[in-house]
């Protein structure tokens, strides 16, 4: 009847619409499911989904599903979730095998010979560049870089000029953050949208939004607690990001 994606971090697919010893499979955040019938009075919905190449059928709670975003946004978010899973759901530390090698893959994708054992080199921008490259072709216009400031500045300049780009930069009150957007924080020295418009050399951090809820969004980023991890960002009553915890801009996903 409809295509949905898993909203929760993980979701148990059950053989019957009850919470019992009946788990068919556990599927991760963003996983695609097809609903097969209307939601019942208890909130269960019958679905099928592909799990490791095999179609599984069962029941899940409908409120743990969400409507799909664009294909390009789903690819970007899926890349972020895949890295979170690869980093043992946020438990794998950057300097420990095999995780330091995964960080190395991100660095090499932007032409830099480092890995997670180079702990004085923040790799969060390499993470964003890595998942954007993996979500191509729609992100080929992304400013791949080892520093967030480079692509933040680029997104603001492109928006101001009205130029086509996968991301446009906005002030917090100008755009209600959505799935696949990037939340921007300054580090060490306070930054503003207007400052980022004239400079691409400042300390910063970005995470990709993978969940939108009432009053907050959750986003995944690299080098969050020395792993791939979640952050929660608060929204105001109008649905805009609050200017707290160093948040100063949002990059809208245009694709």
Where are these regions (language model features)?
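Short beta-strand/loop turn elements enriched in aromatics
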Residues: 1-8, 125-161
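Aromatic- and glycine-rich peptidoglycan recognition patches
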Residues: 5, 9-15, 21, 38, ...
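Conserved positions within tandem-repeat grammars
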Residues: 11, 58, 168-170
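Solvent-exposed, acidic/flexible segments
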Residues: 20, 26, 40, 70-73, ...
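SH3/SH3-like beta-barrel superfamily modules
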Residues: 25-62
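Short, flexible surface segments
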Residues: 29, 79, 178-180
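N-terminal capping segments
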Residues: 66-142
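...with weaker cross-activation on analogous glycine-rich loops/strands in unrelated enzymes
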Residues: 140-226
């Amino acid at each position: 009847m409809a295509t949905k994606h898993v909203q929760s971090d993980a979701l148990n697919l059950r053989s019957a619409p009850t919470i019992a010893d009946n788990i068919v499979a556990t599927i991760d955040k963003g996983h695609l499911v097809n609903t097969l019938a209307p939601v019942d009075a208890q909130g269960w919905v019958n679905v099928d989904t592909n799990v490791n190449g095999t179609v599984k059928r069962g029941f899940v709670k409908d409120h743990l599903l969400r409507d799909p975003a664009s294909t390009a946004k789903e690819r970007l978010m899926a890349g972020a979730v895949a890295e979170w899973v690869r980093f043992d759901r946020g438990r794998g530390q950057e300097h420990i095998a095999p995780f330091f090698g995964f960080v190395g893959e991100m660095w090499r994708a932007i032409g830099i010979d480092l890995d997670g054992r180079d702990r004085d080199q923040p790799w969060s921008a390499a993470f964003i560049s890595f998942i954007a490259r993996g979500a191509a072709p729609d992100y080929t216009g992304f400013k791949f870089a080892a520093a967030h400031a480079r692509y933040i500045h680029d997104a603001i300049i492109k928006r101001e000029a009205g130029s086509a780009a996968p991301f446009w930069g906005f002030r917090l009150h100008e755009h209600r953050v959505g799935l696949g957007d990037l939340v921007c924080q300054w580090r060490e020295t306070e930054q503003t949208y207007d400052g980022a418009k004239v400079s691409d050399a400042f300390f910063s951090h970005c995470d990709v939004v993978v969940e939108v809820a009432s009053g907050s969004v959750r986003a995944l980023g690299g080098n969050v607690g020395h792993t791939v991890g979640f952050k929660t960002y608060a929204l105001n009553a109008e649905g805009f990001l609050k200017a707290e915890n160093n948040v100063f801009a949002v990059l809208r996903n245009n694709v």
